[in-house]
Regions:
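Positively charged n-region of N-terminal signal peptides that target proteins for export
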Residues: 1-4
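Bacterial N-terminal signal peptides
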Residues: 7-13
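C-terminal motif of bacterial Sec signal peptides marking the signal peptidase cleavage site
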Residues: 15-17
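Short, well-ordered, aromatic-rich surface patches in folded extracellular/luminal domains
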Residues: 19-40, 99-147
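Post-signal-peptide N-terminal segment of Sec-exported extracytoplasmic proteins
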Residues: 38-68
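Hydrophobic/aromatic beta-strand elements that line small-molecule binding cavities or substrate pockets
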Residues: 46-52, 72-77, 109-111
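A short, structured loop/turn motif at beta-sheet edges
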Residues: 53, 76-84, 113-117
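Mature extracytoplasmic domains of secretory-pathway proteins
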Residues: 61-99
């Protein structure tokens, strides 16, 4: 039993160490959470984007085919906030909610860092929505309902 606990602990350390971020890695980044809703052909694409360049950051929400921006918010984040955000985004991509068995709902996500390292997923990144609520100062679903 002790060997199993030690193995799990070491595996977790290696998992966290693999994604150790340097400040230059997240100086500039862009994250997209795209959702395809196959039951509504006129507006079947929805996209959230969070991007930062230095301390300047922007959140956009786009709807439609082709995508058209309906909501935009600009904000500033310090280095510690950006590091926390990027770390949570990576965690969420790796552990996102899987909808592969669902035919009418298809989420995908993509994170691009300053060092050109990319993370991709075909899951709903629940960590992203927690971050989004915090940065928006309201629940993201309120914005979805408006558009």
């Amino acid at each position: 039993m002790k060997k199993l606990i030690i193995f799990i602990f070491l595996s977790l350390i290696l998992f966290v160490a693999c994604d150790k971020l340097n400040q230059e890695d997240y100086k500039k980044f862009s994250y997209d959470e795209n959702i395809s809703l196959y039951g509504t052909p006129e507006n079947n694409q929805r996209n959230w984007n969070l991007s930062c360049d230095g301390s300047y950051c922007k959140i956009t929400y786009s709807v439609g085919t082709p995508l058209k921006i309906h909501y935009k918010k600009e904000l500033t984040l310090n280095e510690e906030e950006k590091k926390k955000t990027v770390t949570a985004l990576i965690k969420g991509i790796k552990k996102g909610k899987d909808f592969s068995g669902t035919q009418d709902y298809s989420p995908t996500n993509h994170l691009l860092l300053s060092n050109n390292k990319e993370y991709h997923g075909k899951t709903e990144n629940e960590e992203f929505y927690k971050i989004l609520n915090e940065l928006l100062g309201e629940n993201y679903s309120n914005i979805i309902q408006r558009y």
